[in-house]
Amino acid sequence: LHAHQAQAMEQERNFIVATGTGSGKTESFLFPMIEDLLSSQKRSTPGVKAILIYPLNALATDQMHRIARLLFRDLGDPGLTLGRFTGQVQSSAKRRDEEAVLQRMPVFRENFGEDAKVPEGWLLSRKEMLDTPPDILITNYAMLEHILLLPRNQDLLKGANIHWMVLDEIHTYTGAQAIEVAFLIRKLKASLGIKSGTVRCVGTSASLDPSR
């Protein structure tokens, strides 16, 4: 482990990881988050337990593959489920079709092998996630607002028991956008009845100005 990863794992409070690209900032929150979610009490509770918010769809997609590799390959599928809920995800596509698309992607083949099956815990369509919300939800702030506003999406957070909230590339939230995201998070907490101090909030950045 890098020093910043070890320090993050020891934290039991909110923290920000500001370190260079390729230095393992994603693992800084993933390792303690997964360890926490695998505790017997949290594991037995259905619903979304962690929300990972990215500013861009491309980042959300890239991180989905990294987290899937860690969960389903490196950790041998410990029983947590993963889903990405963005505008690029099909609403009700057949899982077989979505699996075929995923299996053709070079990043999937690189992570899992040429003939690997898609892990069952990797939820691929919005319908799958609405029917059985994932433990770890990847999204962006615009889609999170849709989830909270649109009745057809609200089942995604039904019964949610949020323990972790991660904002990646936190330095990108400035000015009016930062205010919008702050209010969105407050709205999320209010709608789910989240009490202060019950959620670990993490911010990550590879470009954070030291003066900030």
Residue ranges and their predicted role:
Residues 25-37, 64, 181-185:
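Motif I (Walker A/P-loop) of helicase-class P-loop NTPases
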Residues 52-53, 136-140, 166, 199-205:
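Structural recognition of the conserved hydrophobic beta-strand(s) that form the central parallel beta-sheet
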Residues 12-17, 46-50, 133-135, 200:
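Pre-Walker A (Motif I) flank of P-loop NTPase domains
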Residues 1-18, 27-35:
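Conserved pre-motif I regulatory segment
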